[in-house]
């Protein structure tokens, strides 16, 4: 389970709530990983990937609009970070899902959660400091 911590708070309610939603989506993957009742998790994995990509695109757009509104000087490089995340999610090799579904979920979650945590604590923190 991935727990939201106070250290992830930026103090901007809209963005903090969107970041929490990204954690909620990641937790769906964690719950699926721990669920032993599904023999075939393929469709559920795909649902999570699609939801993650769509919500991340929404959030990144919202965050970039906010950064533009405050005249954030590093907006372009911040956007590149967002773009690299979306490209990585798009590059998840869905052909590998059936080889070992739990391993696939774990690797996907490792990337997603690490990226989100590091991005919030390092890159996002820059625009509030």
UniProtKB/Swiss-Prot annotation:
Fe cation 1 binds at residues 19, 59, 63, 124. The keyword rRNA-binding does not apply. InterPro entries: Bacteriohemerythrin-like, Haemerythrin_Fe_BS, Hemerythrin, Hemerythrin-like, Hemerythrin-like_sf, Hemerythrin_metal-bd. Pfam families: Hemerythrin. CDD domains: Hemerythrin. One of its GO terms (molecular function) is oxygen carrier activity. Keywords: Iron, Metal-binding, Oxygen transport, Transport. Fe cation 2 binds at residues 63, 78, 82, 119, 124. The keyword Coiled coil does not apply. HAMAP family: Hemerythrin (MF_00556). Belongs to the hemerythrin family. Oxygen-binding protein. May be involved in a storage mechanism or for delivery to oxygen-requiring enzymes. The oxygen-binding site contains two iron atoms. Monomer. NCBIfam families: bact_hemeryth, hemeryth_dom. This is Bacteriohemerythrin. The lineage of its organism: Bacteria, Bacillati, Bacillota, Clostridia, Eubacteriales.
């Amino acid at each position: 389970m991935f727990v939201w911590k106070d250290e992830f708070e930026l103090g901007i309610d809209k963005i903090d709530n969107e970041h929490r939603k990204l954690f909620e989506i990641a937790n769906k993957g964690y719950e699926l990983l721990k669920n032993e009742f599904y023999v075939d998790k393929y469709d559920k994995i795909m649902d999570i990937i699609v939801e993650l990509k769509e919500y991340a695109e929404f959030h990144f757009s919202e965050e970039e609009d906010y950064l533009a509104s405050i005249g954030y000087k590093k907006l372009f490089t911040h956007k590149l970070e967002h773009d690299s995340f979306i490209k990585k999610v798009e590059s998840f090799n869905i052909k590998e899902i059936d080889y070992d579904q739990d391993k696939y979920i774990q690797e996907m979650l490792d990337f997603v959660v690490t990226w989100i945590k590091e991005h919030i604590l390092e890159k996002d923190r820059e625009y509030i400091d």
